[in-house]
Structure formats: structure tokens, C-alpha cells
Amino acid sequence: MSRFVLNEDVETATFDWGTAGMRGAPTITGCESYVVMDVELAPGFAHPFHKHPDQDEMIVLKAGRIVQWLGEDQRELGPGDSVHIDRDVVHGSYNDFDEPAHLQVVLAPAHGEGGYTAVDVSSEEPWASLRG
């Protein structure tokens, strides 16, 4: 259903790696085409290596810096930088810096009950050894 989504409408969930505000998900908008999240990674926090078997993803860094892994490649991203991740590609976002990182994340299509599913692979090789 078409609607305005105000900040007070955003449902925020807390994870081991930080917070995610569900700005656009089936439970909020009824849209099953995509999911939009506002993510904050506090200094020293990460969304460790994982993949989305049924979803493509775009991450746009709005503020702060992160070390973004895409497969076994990494790059430091700053405000305005982004990464596109095809479905089933392992990736991870790490805030190795002294300030919070704010990301806007879009996943498509919406999948699962909340619109978002991830498979943690951070304890599997080679991912478990990549960050030392």
C-alpha cells in the first residue's frame, strides 16, 4: 500500500552487529518487491560474513566509514560509497573506526516473514580466517 513512512514508523531491531530500522518491509508497507533498512554499526561492531541466498543487496554508506568485504575482496568505504551484492555472494560490513557508521540497505525481493533473511557463514572457511 502506498504510504508515507515517518521516522516514528520505523521498527528498529537490535542484532549482535548493531541496529537495523525496517523502513520498507512487507510488515510495514505491504511491498514484497524490496526491503529498505537504516543500519547503524557502532565502532568496533560488524555484520560479519553472511549471504542472502534469495536476495540481491545494495549498501549505501551515509556517514562514517566501514571495511566492506565482497567475497574475498575488501575496500574501505566512506560517505556516498556503495556496493552491489548479488544473491548468494558472501559479504560482511566491519566498522573498524572510531565513529558510528550509518548505512542504507536495500534487499530485493523481500523474503521471509520480515522481508529479510541471512545465512551466517562467519565461522566457516575461508571467512573465519580472513580478518586475522
Task: Kindly give the residue locations of the regions a language model identified.
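A short beta-strand-loop-beta hairpin characteristic of the jelly-roll/cupin
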Residues: 46, 53-79, 89
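A short, N-terminal "cap"/entry segment at the start of jelly-roll beta-barrel domains
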Residues: 1-33, 118-132
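Short histidine-centered beta-strand/loop micro-motifs
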Residues: 25-29, 47-52, 94-96, 120
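Conserved hydrophobic/aromatic beta-strand scaffold that supports enzyme active sites
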Residues: 36-40, 58, 74, 82-84, ...
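Ligand-binding loop in jelly-roll beta-barrel domains
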Residues: 79, 87-113
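Short, charged/polar surface micro-motifs in flexible loops or helix N-caps
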Residues: 30-34, 42-45, 65-66, 109-113
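Conserved short histidine dyad/triad with adjacent acidic residue
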Residues: 21, 37-52
